[in-house]
C-alpha cells in the first residue's frame, strides 16, 4: 500500500463497522487522498470517502457485487438541479438497481438522510436504498406496487437481489 505516515495514522485509528481492507492512501499536494477502485483514481480522503471506500470494498469482496456494475458520484437531475448519488449499482442492462448514500462516521443517520436518498430515488426508481455512516447501515427494499418499503436485516448478497 502507498501509505504516507501522516495520512494513514489518522485513518488507521478510525475503525468502522465494516471489514478492514488494504487501502491505498497517499498525500498529494499536501492533501490526503485514497484510491477509489470504482473510479480508478485517487480522490480526496474525507471521513465520508473513508466510509464509501470501505462500504464499496464490503459490497465487492464480501457480498459479491460486480465492480463493473458499480458507479460512484452518479449525477442525477432533480427539479432543475444536478445532484450526486454516492454509489449506484446497475443491472446488466444499465438500469439503476440500488442507491447507496454515505455519511461520515460522526454524522447521525436521521430522517433527513433518508429524505435525501428518497429524492434521488424519485429519479432513478431503484429496488434498494442503503444508507451508511460506516457504523450503522440501513437497507430497504422498495415496493412500488404497494407504495411502501421494507427494512432488511442485512445488506443482501448480489446473487439474492
Regions found by a protein language model. Name each.
Residues 1-11:
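Single conserved hydrophobic/aromatic residue that forms the stacking wall/gate
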Amino acid at each position: 500500500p502507498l501509505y504516507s505516515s501522516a495520512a494513514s495514522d489518522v485513518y488507521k485509528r478510525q475503525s468502522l463497522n465494516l471489514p478492514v481492507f488494504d487501502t491505498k492512501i497517499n498525500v498529494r499536494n499536501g492533501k490526503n487522498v485514497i484510491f477509489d477502485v470504482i473510479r480508478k483514481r485517487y480522490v480526496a480522503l474525507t471521513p465520508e470517502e473513508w466510509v464509501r471506500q470501505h462500504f464499496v470494498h464490503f459490497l465487492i469482496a464480501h457480498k459479491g457485487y460486480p465492480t463493473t456494475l458499480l458507479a460512484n458520484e452518479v449525477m442525477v437531475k432533480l427539479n432543475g438541479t444536478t445532484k450526486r448519488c454516492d454509489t449506484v449499482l446497475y443491472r446488466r442492462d444499465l438500469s439503476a438497481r440500488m442507491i447507496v448514500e454515505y455519511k461520515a462516521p460522526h454524522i447521525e443517520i436521521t430522517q433527513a438522510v433518508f429524505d435525501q436518498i428518497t429524492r434521488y430515488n424519485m429519479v432513478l426508481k431503484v429496488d434498494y436504498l442503503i444508507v451508511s455512516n460506516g457504523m450503522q447501515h440501513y437497507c430497504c427494499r422498495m415496493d412500488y406496487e404497494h407504495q411502501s418499503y421494507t427494512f432488511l436485516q442485512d445488506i443482501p448478497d448480489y446473487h439474492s437481489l
